[in-house]
């Protein structure tokens, strides 16, 4: 009996030792080499892919390292290649329903993916990636990533066509949440092509950090405490946009994916630069909207919100220097777009010399051009000469003698509905030189065949040396601009423009009455000149006071058009020249089918 019990005890102890040693055998190098070969063979037999592993090492309790791994597709294209993959897990936490990942690290890793029809190609070449002390709570469906780093990355995405953002009707969002302590990026380059819409979209980031983030996959929301991008370089080259492919139709069992909610408490960009360039564009002097290059971009946005088409961007600071030399030093304001419409509130932009402030609000019907959409615009600006010639350098010669800080002042107010807009005021002035004021109304602005409107204006020119400075030398010595007042009004209908304008200087008056049929290209009018002092404008010539009247009419605008017809009948009641007064002069001129005739 004692021997039987002894044998039973030996068997039980042997089984126990065997059960304990079998799991530990996976830490034996020979067993690991055998397991490496078995894994490679199984992947080949089950997927048709080819897996090659240089070295596999597993250390207690669970620290796995795989060196020189290569995974090839059945067509022998590289899907994954890495010099080193390290994974460290605490197995004891599994008993509590948690996966505690002590470390995941990738070194010199290449990933390439191409779908079956080659409309999508994604590749990522990662120098170093690591995450430490991560935790996966299997009971609460929560993932915690306290610290993640990506150093050196080359990411490329090529799309031949875009697919609609849809999900299966039977699918449901995953009930998982992810919390992020810090994500650090350095030396990352991203490139995207989606021809013909996008020729190339390129982004290089020297350093970026994301702090305290929360991702709710079920609620489809992302919340970030702070995002910082330092020394980013962004380049966008749009394509031709001529895609003749037929648009894809959604399958009957798909629905549009609900929008994600993205909230960023603090967004900061420091020392960034950006380029927008049309294909084959040769940059022009000044501000070229086909070639925009911004440098030293500084952005500060607090409480950024986006959910589908809803967006709120409270701009705390925006500064940059454009290639033309325009340097924006300060920008503030809040842009919002939601179901009620769009608005730009408390917007202010400054350069060293200029400033612009604006308040803009429009109802959501602005997107569908609904005539009942309410619209309100308030705009005030001071545009300095120094900034204007940077934007339009071709006018530099016309600003001689003007201080660069001299500024055009404007104050514009509009309100009403899209189908019935009122121009409350449009005041534009150059202090000491001119003042212009206008009011008006326009109806059916978005419908060219139904448009109607009216405009009233007044322009006062002052006796300023500015006019002589902006004229060429050959004219500045001959022409003088005395105090002059321009007034007028115009009425616009779908086919007709009617206008009345007057010019007053001294005791003289010029009145213009005109009509233009825009559809038939027909026009007629009268010009009445009453004692107008030509000598005030041409002081070095021999002309004096002029009184005259002119009638004109015609059809077509181009004199080279064989169907053009025009007549001009000028009657001079009196004109002073070289101290003599001439009266009773008349001049007639006619252009008919390319033939000109006239008489005095």
Which residue ranges define each predicted feature?
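Amphipathic hydrophobic-ligand
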Residues: 46, 75-88, 117-131, 144-145, ...
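Sequence/structural signature of outer-membrane beta-barrel proteins
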Residues: 111-114, 195, 532-536, 573-577
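Transmembrane beta-strand segments that form the barrel wall of outer-membrane beta-barrel proteins
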Residues: 314-318, 341-348, 421-428, 495-503, ...
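Transmembrane beta-strands of outer-membrane beta-barrel proteins
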Residues: 225, 375-377, 453, 499, ...
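Flexible beta-edge/linker motif
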Residues: 55-160, 171-240, 253-274, 295-316, ...
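Outer-membrane beta-barrel pore domains and translocons
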Residues: 151, 230, 318, 349-350, ...
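Outer-membrane beta-barrel proteins
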Residues: 157-159, 236-238, 356, 388-392, ...
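N-terminal type II signal-anchor transmembrane helix
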Residues: 1-48
């Amino acid at each position: 009996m004692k021997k039987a019990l002894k044998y039973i005890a030996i068997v039980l102890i042997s089984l126990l030792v065997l059960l304990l040693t079998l799991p530990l055998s996976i830490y034996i190098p020979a067993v690991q080499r055998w397991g490496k070969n078995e894994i490679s063979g199984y992947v080949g037999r089950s997927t048709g892919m080819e897996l090659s592993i240089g070295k596999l090492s597993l250390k207690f309790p669970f620290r796995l390292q795989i060196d020189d791994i290569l995974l090839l597709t059945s067509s022998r294209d590289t899907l994954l290649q890495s010099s080193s993959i390290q994974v460290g897990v605490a197995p004891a936490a599994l008993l509590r329903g948690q996966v505690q990942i002590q470390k995941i690290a990738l070194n010199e890793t290449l990933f390439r993916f191409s779908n079956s029809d080659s409309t999508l190609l994604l590749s990522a070449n990662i120098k170093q990636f690591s995450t430490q002390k991560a935790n996966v709570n299997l009971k609460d469906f929560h993932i915690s990533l306290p610290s993640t780093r990506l150093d050196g990355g080359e990411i490329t995405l090529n799309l031949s066509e875009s697919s609609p953002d849809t999900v299966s009707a039977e699918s449901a969002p995953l009930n998982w949440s992810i919390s992020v302590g810090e994500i650090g990026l350095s030396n990352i380059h991203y490139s995207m092509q989606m021809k013909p819409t996008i020729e190339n979209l390129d982004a290089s980031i020297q350093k970026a950090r994301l702090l305290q983030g929360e991702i709710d996959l079920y609620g489809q929301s992302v919340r970030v405490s702070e995002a910082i991008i330092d020394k980013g370089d962004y380049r966008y080259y749009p394509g031709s946009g001529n895609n003749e492919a037929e648009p894809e139709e959604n399958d009957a069992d798909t629905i549009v994916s609900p929008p994600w909610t993205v909230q960023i408490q603090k967004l900061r960009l420091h020392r960034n630069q950006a380029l927008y360039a049309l294909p084959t564009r040769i940059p022009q002097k000044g501000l070229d909207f086909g070639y925009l290059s911004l440098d030293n971009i500084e952005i500060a946005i607090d409480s950024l919100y986006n959910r589908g088409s809803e967006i709120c961007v409270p701009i705390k600071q925006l500064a940059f220097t454009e290639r033309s030399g325009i340097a924006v030093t300060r920008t503030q304001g809040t842009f919002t777009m939601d179901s009620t419409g769009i608005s730009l509130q408390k917007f202010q932009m400054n350069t060293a010399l200029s400033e612009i402030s604006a308040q803009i609000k429009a109802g959501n019907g602005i997107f569908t051009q609904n005539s009942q959409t309410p619209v309100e615009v308030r705009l005030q600006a001071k545009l300095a000469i120094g900034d204007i010639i940077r934007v339009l350098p071709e006018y530099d010669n016309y600003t001689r003698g003007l201080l660069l800080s001299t500024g055009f002042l404007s104050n514009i107010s509009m309100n009403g509905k899209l189908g019935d807009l009122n121009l409350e005021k449009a005041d534009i002035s150059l202090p000491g030189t001119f003042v212009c004021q206008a009011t008006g109304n326009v109806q059916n602005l978005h419908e060219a065949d139904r448009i109607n409107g009216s405009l009233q204006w007044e322009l006062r020119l002052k006796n300023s040396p500015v006019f002589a400075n902006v004229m060429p030398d050959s004219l500045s010595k001959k022409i003088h601009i005395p105090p002059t007042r321009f007034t007028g009004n115009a009425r616009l209908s779908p086919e007709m423009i009617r206008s009345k304008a007057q010019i007053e200087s001294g005791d003289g008056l010029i009145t213009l009455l005109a009509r233009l049929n825009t559809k038939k290209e027909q026009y007629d009018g009268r010009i009445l000149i009453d004692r107008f002092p030509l000598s005030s404008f041409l002081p070095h010539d021999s002309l004096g006071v002029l009184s005259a009247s002119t009638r004109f009419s015609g059809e077509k605008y181009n004199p080279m058009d064989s169907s053009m017809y025009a007549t001009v009948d000028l009657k001079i009641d009196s004109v002073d020249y070289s101290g003599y007064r001439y009266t009773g002069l008349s001049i007639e001129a006619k252009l008919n089918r390319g033939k000109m005739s006239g008489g005095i």
